[in-house]
From Swiss-Prot:
Residues 861-1049 form the Lon proteolytic domain. This is Lon protease homolog, mitochondrial. Residues 71-123, 158-172, 815-825 have a biased composition (Basic and acidic residues). GO terms for molecular function: ATP binding; ATP hydrolysis activity; ATP-dependent peptidase activity; sequence-specific DNA binding; serine-type endopeptidase activity; single-stranded DNA binding. GO terms for cellular component: mitochondrial matrix. It is an enzyme of class 3 (hydrolase). PROSITE patterns: LON_N, LON_PROTEOLYTIC. It catalyses: Hydrolysis of proteins in presence of ATP. ATP-dependent serine protease that mediates the selective degradation of misfolded, unassembled or oxidatively damaged polypeptides as well as certain short-lived regulatory proteins in the mitochondrial matrix. May also have a chaperone function in the assembly of inner membrane protein complexes. Participates in the regulation of mitochondrial gene expression and in the maintenance of the integrity of the mitochondrial genome. Binds to mitochondrial DNA in a site-specific manner. Belongs to the peptidase S16 family. Residues 127-157 have a biased composition (Low complexity). It is found in: Mitochondrion matrix. It comes from Candida albicans (strain SC5314 / ATCC MYA-2876). Homohexamer or homoheptamer. Organized in a ring with a central cavity.
């Protein structure tokens, strides 16, 4: 009778209980070695069921023969008396002895049956869960493999060796307690580590490793296994090697892999489970213990190759609670995320088994997601199932987030594409409806037609308009947009639209005087220009250029001219423009092309005769072959600009009616051909008196209005303004002084607010004290009343008190919100009528900081060799320029290095002036004082203080000469005299520029006499009387005249004897040298 029952444990074998005669049992058990137990089978798993069935598997029948053991006793095949039953000698014994043996065998079989019954109830080996290495093999494969293994062991040859010399399977029995594997081929890998449970492709490049793998396959080795370890430093030069150099070269934990198929250097492997590195033998360092055990190992063939092989031990998972809340939560979350990403991955055949095993699930997820090798190695090394799940979940979450972002991006792209497609369909549909209805062009064409009704377009422009208009509706969307944009620009150009000029000189004078103080010469020139226009009836073809320092009001003057002429004002800033297309536009073939700045300015002005200000024309970038400058040659030429063609419009535009006004700081930067086309009007810097008046009339009222103060709240006397100009802003313009005035009003506003707040705080504190006393009295009365009410009815008191508090709270909240809204409303502060702040010269530094210009002069008393020149810069500021000359060595030193050395950041022109002055000074001294041989032995160092400031210009010649002559005569120059002018080798004094600004600088520094070239006398008429007041101008033509003014009363004897003693010492030295030489 046979009874079968299923075990409760998952994947357990069916237990079969059979009642069989003992004689049958004796005959059946005689063929089975009694020493082999099911729980002693190999820990290495058989081939996994999840592999493809069509692959040529190269694997042994059993894996238990691959383990090594430490116990020699376990290596010996155990015997049993039951095995002797089959021998012929047994049959010759007596019946009594035979019965006795049969009874013993029955007892042994009963014991074996009990042992087998216990082992049969254990879980079988899971092919996809190699961690449970000590479990039984499955009923479908384990029993067959066991029988086959026994048969193989019984049929081994007598020599016990394979053809290649490796031991037969019979030499490898059950593992010892240590559970160490025999030496396996060890391979290092740089890429992502392999996790158990999934087939992978491995690429090897080392020839010895390839030979070894091929030998394992071709020789039918029953152990096609190797261990795979990940390299620690993947950035090292040896990271790509397959052979392990030493133990520290790889991580301690790797995977045991089975070779399934090889194709050249590619190996298809199946990682079974984790292993830990115990010992390793490398080609550079062989391990004695491994080499000794290799002689009795089935993998001894590895010694034939220059490869690394290692002894490893299976790394099992730590026990865990299947009911753990954390594990179950993470497992559930992983399953949820995996289901979302499942279409991306290949689904395994044993998916249900993987999903039910947390450890297998962690490995499976980690093998699928994108991650760095270090992250995968961390999961591989972890034996804690909970940790593995956490790490795998983190990687899967990142994968899910990235996939969600990708899906969102694709969705947005799809929606935009569908929307654009729908709009395109609607647009085409609308066009067809309009065309079928005979309505004609869309509303844009109607808008263009309405525009040209108010224009007097020339024939060429009208022809271009009609041609492009006909193209509408017949082009693609891209061409359609280009045509519409062209028509839009073309119909905005004000063809034939003009404003009527006003030539009222009186009105123009009023406007100029209203907006500007001073600048008499500039105003006169502008009024003359308007008067000529009134007589001729037009101001066509005029190009003005206002040249002057920054901040002198050139731009505002242009606005005033436009207002005086009743013309529209438009401005073009060309500073830094280098591309001609910025001026003349791009052709329509370019994407997003537009007209140039000239046509754009016309469309903004909406008239064909505006005043067009071309600002900063001296800062045109001329480095790119002068492209933009060449474009302005056509625009500013009255003979050519009546047919200006923009590259975008491609139609002639008349610019002859435009009044061009250019501004520049330095005329020398404007190309010569362009400068010749302009009528130059110089806008000189303001004098000190001009600055004071402009500050009082314009700057102070504007600053007061800006901060919201009435005029008179902040009082700035003339003395304060004068000190502000002298000590803070000496430039010719007004920008810096304007910023300082604004700063004064900002500081004054702050002082006013702080003073008012202090007053409010004092009054608030007083009100608070009185309010506190009243509140305390009220609280006392309320508490007494409440006490009486509570004694009468506590419940009614509580209820009524609660209602009162609620009503009070609601009312107080509403009041607070209203007050908050009132506070948020910005209101102008009411100031007391008597509140004023006066800025005195003594308190000026409290508003604008410490003084910038402390001293007006560098030298109060000039030393011999120091001369005072005058300089002028492009910002319109004039100042004293000191020139110092000294002897570097005494004349009697006899060094023989006479010459000149110049410093002070001088440019080429000033260096030439110094060299010319040195040559002329030597000639002049020889002619005037022949016995003064100063320049024959003197090495002179000439320096201009302020080396950080570059200096250049042809106006310091006489100052250099005077400095050298002063040093040669050892006589100081007058303290009250400054000079300017260039000199030639013959002593001629040449003309210079900027005498007005230099006069301002000399007067500010305290000089009362100015020596200047006689050829510049005409400039005196341009200098205001207030500047010339207190100054004496000395015109000179030759340097001899300069010498007479600077060195009055010096005789020839005095000049010849200046260095007489030094030269006597020099002669004595020369004589002594000759004597010593003889």
């Amino acid at each position: 009778m046979i009874k079968a029952s299923k075990c409760n444990k998952p994947r357990a074998l069916f237990l079969v209980r059979v009642s069989i005669p003992r004689t049958f049992i004796r005959n059946a058990t005689s063929a089975v070695p009694t020493t082999i137990k099911l729980n002693d089978l190999a820990s290495l798993p058989p081939i996994t069921k999840s592999l493809p069935t069509n692959l040529p598997f190269l694997m042994p029948d059993t894996l238990q023969s691959l383990l090594r053991f430490d116990s020699e006793k376990e290596k010996q095949p155990s015997t049993d008396k039951s095995n002797d039953k089959d021998k012929p000698s047994r049959k010759e014994k007596g019946k009594d002895k035979e019965k006795e043996n049969e009874e013993k065998k029955d007892i042994n079989m009963d014991e074996k049956y009990e042992i087998n019954e216990e082992t049969d109830t254990k879980p079988t080996i899971d092919p996809n869960n190699p961690v449970s290495s000590k479990s039984n093999i499955s009923s479908s494969s384990g029993g067959d493999n066991n029988n086959n293994n026994n048969n193989n062991n019984n049929n081994n040859d007598s020599d016990g060796k394979n053809d290649d010399g490796s031991p037969k399977d019979k030499e490898f029995l059950s593992p010892s307690d240590s559970g160490l594997h025999p030496p396996f081929l060890a391979i290092a890998m740089k890429d992502r580590p392999f996790l158990p449970g999934a087939t992978r492709h491995l690429h090897v490049s080392d020839p010895e490793v390839i030979k070894c793998v091929n030998h394992m396959i071709n020789s039918n080795i029953k152990s096609p296994y190797f261990v795979l370890f990940h390299v620690r430093d993947t950035n090292s030069e040896d990271a790509a090697l397959d052979v392990i150099k030493d133990r520290d070269f790889v991580h301690e934990v790797g995977t045991l892999c089975q070779i399934i198929k090889t194709t050249g250097s590619e190996i298809l492997v199946y990682p079974h489970y984790r292993v830990k590195l115990v010992d390793i033998s490398t080609p550079n360092s062989r391990s004695e213990s491994i080499e000794k055990e290799q002689d009795n190992s089935q993998t001894s063939y590895l010694k034939k190759f220059e490869v690394s092989y290692a002894v490893t031990q299976q790394l099992k998972d730590e026990p865990y609670d299947e009911q753990s809340i954390t594990i179950n939560a993470w497992t559930r979350r992983i399953k949820e995320l995996y289901e979302k990403l499942a279409p991306k991955y290949d689904q395994p055949e044993n998916k249900e088994e993987i999903m039910s095993n947390p450890s297998m699930l962690a490995d499976f997820i980690a093998s699928k997601v994108h991650a760095k090798p270090e992250q995968i190695q961390e999961i591989l090394e972890s034996s804690n199932v909970e940790t593995k799940l956490e790490l795998s979940l983190q990687l899967l979450q990142v994968e899910a987030d990235a996939d969600e972002m990708r899906q969102t991006a694709l969705k947005n792209i799809r929606e935009r594409t569908e929307k654009a497609y729908a709009q395109s369909l609607i647009k085409e549909y609308t066009k067809e409806l309009l065309k079928a209805a005979g309505i004609g062009e869309n509303s844009k064409v109607h808008k263009f037609d309405e525009r040209i009704k108010h224009l007097k377009m020339p024939e060429e422009a009208m022809k271009a308009y009609k041609t492009e208009k006909e193209r509408l509706g017949t082009q693609s969307d891209m061409e359609q947009n280009v045509v519409e944009r062209y028509l839009d620009w073309l119909t905005q150009i004000p063809f034939g639209v003009y404003t009527k000029d006003s030539f009222n000189v009186k009105k123009a004078r009023e406007i100029l005087d209203r907006d500007h103080y001073g600048l008499k010469d500039v105003k006169d020139r502008i009024l003359e220009f308007i008067s000529v226009g009134k007589i001729s009836g037009n101001v066509d073809g005029k190009i003005l250029c206002l040249a002057g320092p920054p901040g002198t009001g050139k731009t505002s003057i242009a606005k005033s001219i436009a207002e005086a002429l009743n013309r529209k004002y438009t401005r073009i800033a060309v500073g830094g423009v280098q591309d001609v297309h910025d001026v003349k536009g791009h052709r329509r073939t370019y994407v997003a092309s537009i007209p140039g700045r000239i046509v754009t300015a016309l469309t903004q002005a909406k008239t064909s005769n505006p005043l067009m200000l071309i600002d900063e024309i001296d800062k045109l970038d001329t480095t790119s072959h002068g492209g933009a400058a060449r474009a302005f040659l056509e625009i500013l030429d009255p003979e050519q600009n009546n047919s200006f063609v923009d590259n975008f419009i491609e139609v002639k535009v008349d610019l002859s009616k435009v009044l061009f006004v250019c501004t520049a700081n330095y005329l020398g930067s404007i190309p010569g051909p362009l400068r010749d086309r302009m009528e130059i009007i110089e806008v000189n810097g303001y004098t000190k008196n001009d600055k004071i008046e402009i500050t009082k009339r314009h700057l102070i009222p504007a600053a007061a209005k800006k901060v919201g103060l009435d005029e008179g709240r902040v009082v700035i006397p003339d003395e304060t303004i004068s000190r502000l100009i002298d000590k803070y802003c000496r430039e010719s313009g007004l920008r810096h002084i304007k910023s300082l005035i604004n700063r004064i009003f900002s500081k004054a506003s702050r002082k006013i607010v702080e003073e008012l707040e202090e007053t409010d705080v004092d009054s608030h504190n007083k009100d608070t004290v009185e309010g506190t006393l009243v509140a305390k009295e009220s609280e006392k009365v309320i508490s007494d009343k409440a006490k009486i009410d509570t004694e009468n009815s506590p419940i009614e008191y509580i209820q009524s008190n609660t209602e009162v508090k609620a009503e009070t709270t609601t009312e107080s909240q509403q009041e607070q919100e209203k007050e908050k809204e009132k506070d948020e409303e910005i209101k102008k502060l009411d100031l007391p009528a008597d509140l004023k702040i006066e800025v005195k010269p003594e308190t000026l530094k409290d508003f604008v900081g410490p003084e910038i210009y402390i001293k007006d002069r560098l030298y109060e008393t000039l030393n011999p060799g120091v001369a005072t020149g005058l300089a002028y810069n492009t910002s319109g500021d004039g100042d004293a320029l000191y020139i110092e000359s000294i002897l570097t060595d005494s004349i009697s030193s006899d060094l023989g290095n006479a010459g000149l050395h110049v410093t002070g950041s001088l440019k080429d022109v000033m260096k030439e002036s110094a060299s010319i002055a040195y040559s002329f000074a030597k000639q002049f001294m020889v002619r005037q004082f022949p016995d003064n041989r100063f320049f024959e032995a003197a090495h002179i160092h000439v320096h201009c203080p302020g080396g950080a400031i570059p200096k250049d210009g042809p106006s310091a010649g006489i100052a250099f000469t005077s400095s050298l002559v002063s040093l040669a005569l050892n006589k100081s120059l007058p303290n009250d005299t400054a000079m300017t002018g260039e000199i030639t080798l013959t002593g001629k004094v040449l003309a210079i520029g900027g005498l007005r600004e230099k006069s301002l600088g000399a007067k500010r520094a305290g000089y009362t006499k100015i020596i200047f070239p006689k050829d510049c006398e005409y400039q005196l008429d341009e200098i205001p009387d207030e500047v010339k007041e207190g100054l004496t101008y000395i015109p000179v033509e030759w340097y001899s005249e300069v010498f007479e003014h600077l060195f009055q009363g010096i005789s020839k004897e005095e000049g010849n004897s200046v260095w007489k003693e030094e030269f006597a010492k020099l002669e004595d030295k020369k004589k002594s040298k000759k004597t010593n030489t003889k």
